[in-house]
Amino acid sequence: MSKRDFYEVLGVSRDASERDIKKAYKRLAMKFHPDRNQGDDTAAEKFKEVKVAYEILTDAQKRSAYDQYGHAAFEQGGMGGGGFGGGGADFGDIFGDVFGDIFGGGRRGGQQRAQRGSDLRYNMELTLEEAGRGCDKEIEVPTLVSCDPCEGTGAKKGTSSTTCSTCHGQGQVQMRQGFFAVQQACPTCHGKGKIIKDPCNSCHGEGRVHKTKTLNVKIPSGVDTGDRIRLSGEGEAGEHGAPAGDLYVQVHVKEHNIFERDGNNLYCEVPVSFTMAALGGEVEVPTLDGRVSLKVPLETQTGRMFRMRGKGVKGVRTHSAGDLIVKLIVETPVKLTKRQKELLQEFQESFDGKDAKKHNPKSEGFLSGVKNFFDDLTK
């Protein structure tokens, strides 16, 4: 089966700069990385192919040889006796150089370090009251914790791991590939450099066991949907004493039946009777801290907005509270008695006459506008 062109594998031109090659490699390595495609053999093969292409094209000598001889430069017997001499070149491990600690750090030229524990995510649903005021929440998180009997070493108590005889503790072995020496993880110790001959009975040599942890999470006031709270070191335990990962609490705030939230401001609608709207008065308004009184001015129209400063949500960083915006909705009375209807009719008749306009300015203005509109149409 023929091998694909390395430039084609990375999707770059033959005159691509090293920066362009690194950029393409980052994108493809993240796409096909085994951690993201567990159980997908095709993705694993593509990841290997991408990695080899990157190793060749980012080394000036190897790239020059590839441009001149193609894949033959790296096959046994390729290029005859020419090339780079008998010393060969060490591929090392370029993965850590490119991604740093994104995938747990590099391992160039030495023993593979025990891997840091994985980060975990916990989805937490909060009420608006909890998010607005802040609260303490107790959560249970299934995770991997350090094994107590062996203290995370993986070896039975009273014993210890021994140096791998295959790689002599280096965690890597050297393989010949054409004219080059390629460093690979030791197949005996899987890159750790140590062998556990007498594994712990509790964790079977893993150094970690499954457990459900109970944690208390302090929720600061002002959090909102999409916010994350980081609990350092509360993720999965690391391998054989390596640092633990972190736990990220993902916040989702439930919809409220009274308030709508926009940043640190709250909005609500408060119904008032038409008599209160006309004559003025006071109405109780709900807030996150309890009920407060709002003064309704004379002749208030429906939809009028009132700002109650400091009655919103406290900011996570600023700690200053937003405002509560109250929209008054004037209610039309329903299920009237005969007497109430008579009184309203008398009330309506009292508006008739030359003073009607001043009692209903918006209605009169609207009717006047409608009349002018139709007059213009008939011209």
Swiss-Prot record:
GO terms for molecular function: ATP binding; heat shock protein binding; unfolded protein binding; zinc ion binding. CXXCXGXG motif repeats lie at residues 147-154, 164-171, 186-193, 200-207. It holds the Pfam family DnaJ_C. Its cofactor is Zn(2+). GO terms for cellular component: cytoplasm. Transmembrane segments: none annotated. The keyword Chaperone applies. The keyword Repeat applies. It comes from the Bacteria. A zinc finger (CR-type) spans 134-212. Residues 5-70 form the J domain. Zn(2+) 1 binds at C147, C150, C200, C203. It is found in: Cytoplasm. Binds 2 Zn(2+) ions per monomer. Keywords: Chaperone, Cytoplasm, DNA replication, Metal-binding, Repeat, Stress response, Zinc, Zinc-finger. Participates actively in the response to hyperosmotic and heat shock by preventing the aggregation of stress-denatured proteins and by disaggregating proteins, also in an autonomous, DnaK-independent fashion. Unfolded proteins bind initially to DnaJ; upon interaction with the DnaJ-bound protein, DnaK hydrolyzes its bound ATP, resulting in the formation of a stable complex. GrpE releases ADP from DnaK; ATP binding to DnaK triggers the release of the substrate protein, thus completing the reaction cycle. This is Chaperone protein DnaJ. It comes from Aliivibrio fischeri (strain ATCC 700601 / ES114).
